[in-house]
């Protein structure tokens, strides 16, 4: 799909139509919009089958409400967030604050591969192997300094994981 920055219909998370983008080097990215979440069942519990869809057997249930940009209001009008741990508590995910609040983050759609010593994110190729954490960090920083590219942080990974376990995933 080709689109412009003003096209409001190029993605629809409710319909599981993800905002995918391809950069000039062919790398593929997906937009993770800022959201609030609540773990509504299974908080701090483990099950026999982590992949089960039954909360009593698996990883529990996560509800997600997308935020309106960088405001403190969700798409449903919720403005009260506890931002504390616990089942049933609503939290604005911390991954969307990297020195300042952002409306979302671009995440590599696939594991990074090596193309002549440069990062490339494309399907169907082997992941970059035999690289030190220091070199991963440096390569990620240098990918696009203007856009603040960096090695994924734990909370950003958590944002992707939580979203994938919600009804949108």
Q: Where are the language model's segments positioned?
A:
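GGW-centered surface loops in extracellular recognition modules
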Residues: 1-42, 149
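Short, solvent-exposed loop/turn elements at domain surfaces
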Residues: 38-45, 114-119
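A motif-centric signal for short, conserved binding hotspots located
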Residues: 46, 51
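Residue-level detector of solvent-exposed, low-hydrophobicity positions
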Residues: 17-18, 42-44, 135, 164
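Short aromatic-cysteine micro-motif
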Residues: 25-26, 57-60, 64-169
């Amino acid at each position: 799909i080709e689109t412009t920055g003003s096209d409001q219909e190029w993605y629809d998370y409710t319909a599981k139509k993800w905002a995918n983008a391809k950069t000039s080097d062919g790398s593929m990215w997906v937009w993770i919009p800022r959201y609030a979440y609540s773990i509504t069942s299974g908080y701090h519990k483990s099950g026999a089958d982590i992949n089960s869809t039954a909360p009593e057997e698996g990883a529990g249930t996560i509800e997600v409400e997308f935020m309106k940009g960088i405001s403190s209001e969700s798409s449903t009008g919720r403005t009260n967030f506890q931002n504390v741990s616990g089942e049933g508590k609503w939290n604005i995910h911390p991954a969307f604050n990297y020195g300042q609040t952002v409306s979302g983050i671009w995440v590599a759609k696939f594991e990074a591969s090596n193309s002549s010593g440069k990062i490339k994110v494309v399907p169907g190729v082997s992941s970059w192997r035999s690289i030190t954490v220091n070199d991963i960090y440096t390569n990620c920083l240098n990918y696009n300094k203007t856009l603040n590219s960096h090695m994924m942080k734990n909370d950003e990974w958590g944002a992707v994981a939580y979203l994938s376990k919600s009804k949108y995933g």
